[in-house]
UniProtKB/Swiss-Prot annotation:
Keywords for the protein's UniProt record, in alphabetical order: Photosynthesis, Photosystem I, Signal
Signal sequence segment: 1-23
Similarity comment: family membership: Belongs to the PsaF family.
GO biological process terms on file: photosynthesis
Record lineage: Bacteria, Bacillati, Cyanobacteriota, Cyanophyceae, Synechococcales
Native species: Synechococcus sp. (strain ATCC 27144 / PCC 6301 / SAUG 1402/1)
Any one Gene Ontology cellular component term annotated for this protein: photosystem I reaction center
Protein name: Photosystem I reaction center subunit III
Length: 159
Protein backbone atom coordinates (compact mmCIF):
# COMPACT_ATOMS: atom_id res chain seq x y z
CA UNK A 1 0.00 0.00 0.00
CA UNK A 2 2.87 2.35 0.82
CA UNK A 3 4.53 1.67 -2.51
CA UNK A 4 1.29 2.32 -4.38
CA UNK A 5 0.84 5.59 -2.51
CA UNK A 6 4.46 6.56 -3.27
CA UNK A 7 4.01 5.76 -6.98
CA UNK A 8 0.73 7.70 -7.18
CA UNK A 9 2.26 10.65 -5.33
CA UNK A 10 5.33 10.65 -7.59
CA UNK A 11 3.14 10.49 -10.71
CA UNK A 12 0.93 13.34 -9.50
CA UNK A 13 3.91 15.50 -8.68
CA UNK A 14 5.67 14.67 -11.93
CA UNK A 15 2.65 15.28 -14.15
CA UNK A 16 1.23 18.11 -12.06
CA UNK A 17 3.93 20.65 -12.79
CA UNK A 18 3.38 22.68 -15.93
CA UNK A 19 6.27 24.08 -17.91
CA UNK A 20 6.86 27.79 -17.62
CA UNK A 21 4.76 29.75 -20.10
CA UNK A 22 6.38 32.60 -21.95
CA UNK A 23 4.55 35.40 -23.73
CA UNK A 24 7.01 35.24 -26.59
CA UNK A 25 5.66 31.83 -27.60
CA UNK A 26 2.04 32.46 -26.64
CA UNK A 27 1.07 33.90 -30.02
CA UNK A 28 2.15 37.46 -29.27
CA UNK A 29 4.20 39.33 -31.85
CA UNK A 30 5.74 42.79 -31.81
CA UNK A 31 3.00 45.24 -32.74
CA UNK A 32 5.16 46.74 -35.47
CA UNK A 33 5.00 43.33 -37.24
CA UNK A 34 1.28 42.66 -36.65
CA UNK A 35 -0.80 43.19 -39.83
CA UNK A 36 -3.96 44.06 -37.85
CA UNK A 37 -2.06 46.63 -35.77
CA UNK A 38 -0.54 48.18 -38.89
CA UNK A 39 -4.02 48.35 -40.44
CA UNK A 40 -5.36 50.12 -37.34
CA UNK A 41 -2.36 52.48 -37.28
CA UNK A 42 -2.88 53.46 -40.90
CA UNK A 43 -6.53 54.24 -40.15
CA UNK A 44 -5.59 56.68 -37.36
CA UNK A 45 -6.91 60.13 -38.20
CA UNK A 46 -5.51 62.52 -35.59
CA UNK A 47 -1.86 63.26 -34.82
CA UNK A 48 -2.46 62.15 -31.21
CA UNK A 49 -3.71 58.75 -32.38
CA UNK A 50 -0.73 58.37 -34.73
CA UNK A 51 1.65 59.17 -31.86
CA UNK A 52 -0.15 56.64 -29.65
CA UNK A 53 0.22 53.93 -32.31
CA UNK A 54 3.90 54.85 -32.66
CA UNK A 55 4.38 54.34 -28.91
CA UNK A 56 2.45 51.05 -28.91
CA UNK A 57 4.43 49.68 -31.86
CA UNK A 58 7.11 48.57 -29.37
CA UNK A 59 4.62 46.48 -27.35
CA UNK A 60 3.51 42.90 -28.03
CA UNK A 61 0.21 42.37 -29.85
CA UNK A 62 -2.15 39.44 -30.14
CA UNK A 63 -3.85 38.20 -33.30
CA UNK A 64 -6.46 40.94 -32.88
CA UNK A 65 -3.83 43.64 -33.37
CA UNK A 66 -4.26 45.05 -29.88
CA UNK A 67 -1.35 45.51 -27.45
CA UNK A 68 -1.25 43.10 -24.51
CA UNK A 69 0.08 43.80 -21.04
CA UNK A 70 2.85 41.38 -20.08
CA UNK A 71 2.85 40.64 -16.35
CA UNK A 72 5.34 37.83 -15.89
CA UNK A 73 8.07 39.42 -13.78
CA UNK A 74 10.64 39.95 -16.50
CA UNK A 75 12.35 43.28 -16.06
CA UNK A 76 12.27 44.17 -19.76
CA UNK A 77 8.52 44.78 -19.29
CA UNK A 78 8.91 46.67 -15.99
CA UNK A 79 7.63 49.89 -17.51
CA UNK A 80 4.45 48.15 -18.60
CA UNK A 81 3.30 46.94 -15.19
CA UNK A 82 5.72 47.14 -12.26
CA UNK A 83 6.33 50.88 -12.29
CA UNK A 84 2.63 51.86 -12.67
CA UNK A 85 1.58 49.38 -9.98
CA UNK A 86 4.17 50.72 -7.52
CA UNK A 87 2.99 54.25 -8.29
CA UNK A 88 -0.60 53.16 -7.65
CA UNK A 89 0.36 51.62 -4.30
CA UNK A 90 2.23 54.79 -3.31
CA UNK A 91 -0.74 57.03 -4.17
CA UNK A 92 -3.22 54.71 -2.45
CA UNK A 93 -1.00 54.66 0.64
CA UNK A 94 -0.76 58.46 0.53
CA UNK A 95 -4.55 58.78 0.48
CA UNK A 96 -4.96 56.24 3.28
CA UNK A 97 -2.28 57.82 5.45
CA UNK A 98 -3.75 61.31 5.03
CA UNK A 99 -7.24 60.03 5.86
CA UNK A 100 -5.93 58.21 8.93
CA UNK A 101 -4.06 61.30 10.11
CA UNK A 102 -7.14 63.48 9.59
CA UNK A 103 -9.36 61.09 11.57
CA UNK A 104 -6.83 60.96 14.41
CA UNK A 105 -6.63 64.76 14.48
CA UNK A 106 -10.40 65.30 14.71
CA UNK A 107 -10.96 62.44 17.17
CA UNK A 108 -10.50 64.72 20.20
CA UNK A 109 -12.74 67.48 18.75
CA UNK A 110 -16.18 67.92 20.32
CA UNK A 111 -17.83 67.64 16.88
CA UNK A 112 -15.75 64.76 15.50
CA UNK A 113 -18.69 63.07 13.76
CA UNK A 114 -19.62 66.34 12.09
CA UNK A 115 -16.07 66.82 10.83
CA UNK A 116 -16.15 63.34 9.33
CA UNK A 117 -19.20 64.33 7.28
CA UNK A 118 -18.30 67.97 6.54
CA UNK A 119 -14.54 67.94 6.08
CA UNK A 120 -12.44 70.68 7.66
CA UNK A 121 -10.69 71.66 4.41
CA UNK A 122 -7.73 73.64 5.84
CA UNK A 123 -6.90 70.77 8.19
CA UNK A 124 -7.31 68.19 5.41
CA UNK A 125 -5.08 70.21 3.05
CA UNK A 126 -2.42 70.44 5.78
CA UNK A 127 -2.37 66.66 6.12
CA UNK A 128 -2.48 66.05 2.36
CA UNK A 129 0.57 68.25 1.80
CA UNK A 130 2.59 66.31 4.37
CA UNK A 131 1.33 62.91 3.21
CA UNK A 132 3.97 62.46 0.49
CA UNK A 133 6.39 61.12 3.10
CA UNK A 134 3.95 58.48 4.34
CA UNK A 135 6.34 55.50 3.95
CA UNK A 136 8.86 57.15 6.28
CA UNK A 137 6.15 58.20 8.75
CA UNK A 138 4.67 54.69 8.72
CA UNK A 139 8.08 53.14 9.38
CA UNK A 140 8.72 55.62 12.20
CA UNK A 141 5.37 54.84 13.84
CA UNK A 142 5.89 51.10 13.37
CA UNK A 143 9.35 51.17 14.94
CA UNK A 144 8.11 53.28 17.87
CA UNK A 145 5.09 51.02 18.46
CA UNK A 146 2.42 53.66 17.76
CA UNK A 147 1.21 52.11 14.51
CA UNK A 148 -0.15 48.87 15.97
CA UNK A 149 -2.80 48.62 18.67
CA UNK A 150 -1.94 46.95 21.95
CA UNK A 151 -3.43 43.51 22.62
CA UNK A 152 -5.62 44.76 25.48
CA UNK A 153 -7.21 47.41 23.21
CA UNK A 154 -8.51 44.83 20.74
CA UNK A 155 -11.99 43.53 21.50
CA UNK A 156 -12.76 39.85 21.11
CA UNK A 157 -16.10 38.65 19.84
CA UNK A 158 -18.02 36.63 22.47
CA UNK A 159 -18.94 33.96 19.93
Amino acid sequence: MRRLFAVVLAACLWLGFAPQASADVAGLTPCSESPRFIQRAEAAATPQAKARFENYSQALCGADGLPHLIVDGRLDHAGDFIIPSLLFLYIAGWIGWVGRSYLQAIKSDKDAAGKEIVIDVPLAVKFSLTGFAWPLAAFQEFSSGKLLAKADEITVSPR
